[in-house]
Amino acid sequence: MVLGTSSGAGKSLMTAALCRVLKRRGETPLPFKGQNMSNNAWVDPGGGEMAYSQALQAWAAGREPECAMNPVLLKPQGDSTSEVIHLGRSVGTCRAEHYYRDWFRPGWAAIRQGLHTLENENPEGRLVLEGAGSPVEVNLQARDLTNLRLAQYLRARCLLVADIERGGVFAQIVGTLALLRPVERPLISGLLINRFRGRRELFDEGRRWLEQHTGIPVLGVMPWLDELFPPEDSLDLLERRGRKRGAELEIAVLKLPSLSNFSDLDPLEAEPTVQLRWVAPGEPLGTPDAVVIPGSKQTLRDLGRLHSSGLGSAVQRFARSGGAVFGVCGGMQMLGQELEDPEGLEGQAAAGGNGAMTGLGLLPLRTRFGGEKALRHRQSSVHWPEHQPTLSVEGFELHRGHTHALEPCSNLCEDPSLGWVARCGDQGGIAAGTYLHGIFDNGPWRRRWLNQLRIRRGLELLSEQQPHHSRQRDALLDRLADAFETHVNLEPLL
C-alpha cells in the first residue's frame, strides 16, 4: 500500500509507477483504492463510474480499468454534500456529518466486494493499494475505509510518501509515525521522499537522520517529475507551471467552482505550442485564441457564478466579436439557451424557483436534467471542423439529462446527440460543444481543431498525423517507471 503524509504527496503517481514496474517484471499488478473523493472520473467498459487516477493506474498495469478497482467514489457537489458511487453506480447523496452513520457499513461491504471481484478474476495478481489523504487524521480514524483499516485487513506492506517540495518533510514523516497506533506502525515498511530538486546526495544527511530516528528505511528519493503528468486531483501544481517556450496559442480554460473531469484538458496541456491559462470567476478573460468551458459537477450553480461574476458576459462578448468557444459536457450545457433542473440535481439553489436558468446563449440548446446517468463509451465520425478526410472520435458520456436543439444548427458528430456547432455574431465567432469526454485525446481531431485557431492567427498548420493521447500517456508512464526503478529500492516491499 502506498500511503502519504498528506493529500497531494504523490500517492497516485507512485502507485502508477509501482504498477508499471511490476508489470515489467512479469507480475500481474492490480491497482486498488477502496475509497476516493474526486470529480475527475472515468467510465469503465461496463458503464461503471470510477476515479480517473485508478484508471491511470490500470493503464500503467497494462489492464483495462474496471470500477472494482475503486469501489467507493465520493463526488463532492458543494454544501458538504457528496454523491456516493458504489461499484460504479450512483447510490445516493450524503452530507459529511452523516457519512459514518449512513454509509460506513455499505462502503466497507462495497470495498470487500471489489477486492473479491479483482482477486477472483486474477488469482495470480498482486494488489497494489493506494491510501487517501493522510492515514492519521485522528478525528476520522474510526471512519477510515481506505488507509490502515484496509492495510490491516490485507496485511499489506506500506510505503509512506512525503512531498519535500512543500517543506517540513521531517515533521511530516515523524508526526505521521507518531500518530500511528501501536498495531499500525509495524505495517510501515519504508519511506519515500518525493519531488526532490537538485543532487540527491544533498539529502544523504537527512536520509540518515530519518532512518536513525524512525527505525524505518528510506527506500528512495524521487526527483521532481511533475512536468511529466498533470496532478491527479488538484490544479494547484498545474497552475504554478511557467509559460511554455514555443507556445503560439493561448487557450483560456474556465476554472469552475465545481470543475469536473479536468483530465479532458491533459492532451491540450501536452501540446508544445499550446499554453493553457486557467481563469476563475472574477478574473479577466483577456484575449485568448480560444475559450474552453470544461465539465461541472454542479452545472447550474457554476453557471450562476459565471453570470454573477461577469465572466459569462466576457465569454459572450468574446464569441460574438469573433472568438472560438468550446464546451465539454456541463460546459456545453452552459453554452445553451435554457437549462432546467426541476429535481435540483445540478445546484438548483443558484437557479430560479422552478430550477430553470438562462444559459450563455451561444448555442441554441435546451437541457433538462433528470433520469438515469448516461455512462457509456461512444465512437462517431465528425462533421466539424469541416475538412477532408473525415475523422472519427471516441470518448465517453458521463451526464444526467437530455439536450436538444431549439432551432436548426450543425451537428459536431454523425451522432446528432453528441454535440452541436453554431456561428456567433457577424465577425466569425463560433461556439461548439460535445458530451464526449476525452474528445481532445483524439490526436487528428485535436490538431484539426487547433489548426482552425492557427489559421486565424496566420500560423503554419500542424500535422494531423497525431496518435491517440493514450500513446503519449503510456510513454509518460514508462518515463515515470524508469525514474522509480532508478531511485527506489522495491525489495523490502515485495
UniProtKB/Swiss-Prot annotation:
The active site is at residues 329, 437. One of its GO terms (biological process) is cobalamin biosynthetic process. Residues 248-445 form the GATase cobBQ-type domain. The keyword Nucleotide-binding does not apply. Pathway: Cofactor biosynthesis; adenosylcobalamin biosynthesis. SUPFAM superfamilies: Class I glutamine amidotransferase-like (SSF52317), P-loop containing nucleoside triphosphate hydrolases (SSF52540). Disulfide bonds: none annotated. Pfam families: CbiA, GATase_3. GO terms for molecular function: ABC-type vitamin B12 transporter activity; catalytic activity. Keywords: Cobalamin biosynthesis, Glutamine amidotransferase. Catalyzes amidations at positions B, D, E, and G on adenosylcobyrinic A,C-diamide. NH(2) groups are provided by glutamine, and one molecule of ATP is hydrogenolyzed for each amidation. HAMAP family: CobQ. PANTHER family: COBYRIC ACID SYNTHASE, DETHIOBIOTIN SYNTHETASE. Belongs to the CobB/CobQ family. CobQ subfamily. This is Cobyric acid synthase. The gene is cobQ.
